Swiss-Prot record:
InterPro entries in UniProt: ATPase_YchF/OLA1, Beta-grasp_dom_sf, G_OBG, GTP-bd, P-loop_NTPase, TGS, TGS-like, TGS-like_dom_sf
Name of the protein in its database record: Obg-like ATPase 1
Location relative to the cell: Cytoplasm; Nucleus; Nucleus, Nucleolus
Organism of origin: Pongo abelii
Lineage, top ranks: Eukaryota, Metazoa, Chordata, Craniata, Vertebrata
GO cellular component: cytoplasm; nucleolus
Function: Hydrolyzes ATP, and can also hydrolyze GTP with lower efficiency. Has lower affinity for GTP.
Keyword Cytoplasm on entry: yes
């Protein structure tokens, strides 16, 4: 049976941002809002978490496994010798302060660290604690969110001027017709960011050519955000805090579609110090759960990443790809020969595998698909690739 032409004619929307799968999400916020504590509990590491601004100077970076019941289930079924989940690369960036775009605090260095990331965990503080100073003198997460947004916005505005000046010199005054379209696009970006004071990512109708230009410059306001609200343990457990509704309203108005996830750094730290059995008892007694799995998954999705599985008795592995990746390019993640000699992808949906109970049962039910080179891989696909081995050049 020839492979089906799954995905023919379906073109995924272009993505603003760096191309690739080794993408990073940075933890961004004002000093002393709980960034390093969050990084530590997320990664089980011991980054400095002292109570003073700029205790994090060089960014700390770590890989965090992405929790997935599908992966766990496949491992339980196959009992493989090797288990490799997907990972999220997380960076702890020092606290920004008002005036960072002008070099206040360690502003320029911090903004360059954000520039090196592909998405942002925007962490804000909504807990009171007299022992933990706030750089602005009081707890007001809306004000804090606006400070961060303004600093990123002002840095982009600062970047746009010289880019347009350079293009104008070559494309307009110099008559370089090839660069004229890029100049026109940057004028549109200027109108949106500088004149209308809106982040790059808020405009949802950038076309392919415009996104190509945006991706040359990687503006800070083009990066997707997940808003993390750090609560006291008490507020998190009772699911009440005076700021939560206000934060959600602000995000819905100024960053529509972005997620707002409450968590408690204090609770997560406490859970980390308990044994697995004690942790389970504590969570059940308080009728709550850790927010970390939800946060990790949200960060991974914000970077437009997903993964497919290869599964067998030797190895169960999650292979990270960008959304919209076609089967040959997904095969190339395993080995370049798989892409070069691609014949077809034999695909099972995880849900079908779970429902039927085995690969043979999936085949018997007619749910095992052969897909061609235009098939767009979907998150959670279980795939076996068929390919021709490239011919080795004959020795003379």
């Amino acid at each position: 049976m020839p492979p089906k032409k799954g995905g023919d004619g379906i073109k995924p929307p272009p993505i603003i941002g760096r191309f690739g799968t080794s993408l990073k999400i940075g933890i961004v916020g004002l000093p002393n809002v709980g960034k390093s504590t969050f990084f530590n509990v997320l990664t089980n590491s011991q980054a400095s978490a002292e109570n003073f601004p700029f205790c994090t100077i060089d960014p700390n970076e770590s890989r965090v496994p992405v929790p997935d019941e599908r992966f766990d289930s496949l491992c339980q079924y196959h009992k493989p010798a090797s288990k490799i989940p997907a990972f999220l690369n997380v960076v702890d960036i020092a606290g920004l302060v008002k005036g960072a775009h002008n070099g206040q605090g360690l502003g320029n260095a911090f903004l360059s660290h954000i520039s090196a990331c592909d998405g942002i965990f925007h962490l804000t503080r909504a807990f009171e604690d007299d022992d933990i100073t706030h750089v602005e003198g009081s707890v007001d997460p809306i004000r804090d969110i606006e400070i961060i947004h303004e600093e990123l916005q002002l840095k982009d505005e600062e970047m746009i001027g010289p880019i347009i000046d350079k293009l104008e010199k070559v494309a307009v005054r110099g008559g370089d017709k090839k660069l004229k379209p890029e100049y026109d696009i940057m004028c549109k970006v200027k109108s949106w960011v500088i004149d209308q004071k809106k982040p790059v990512r808020f405009y949802h109708d950038w076309n392919d050519k415009e996104i190509e230009v945006l991706n040359k410059h990687l503006f800070l306001t083009s990066k997707p955000m997940v808003y993390l609200v750090n609560l006291s343990e008490k507020d998190y457990i009772r699911k009440k805090n005076k700021w939560l509704i206000k934060i959600k309203e602000w995000v819905d108005k100024y960053d529509p579609g972005a997620l707002v996830i409450p968590f408690s750094g204090a609770l997560e730290l406490k859970l980390q110090e308990l044994s697995a059995e004690e942790r389970q008892k504590y969570l059940e007694a308080n009728m709550t759960q850790s927010a970390l799995p939800k946060i990790i998954k949200a960060g991974f999705a914000a970077l437009q990443l997903e993964y497919f599985f290869t599964a067998g008795p030797e190895e169960v592995r999650a292979w990270t790809i960008r959304k919209g990746t076609k089967a040959p390019q997904a095969a190339g993640k395993i080995h370049t020969d798989f892409e070069k000699g691609f014949i077809m992808a034999e695909v099972m949906k995880y849900e079908d595998f779970k429902e039927e109970g085995s690969e043979n049962a999936v085949k018997a039910a007619g749910k095992y698909r052969q897909q061609g080179r235009n098939y767009i891989v979907e998150d959670g696909d279980i795939i076996f690739f068929k390919f021709n081995t490239p011919q080795q050049p004959k020795k003379k």
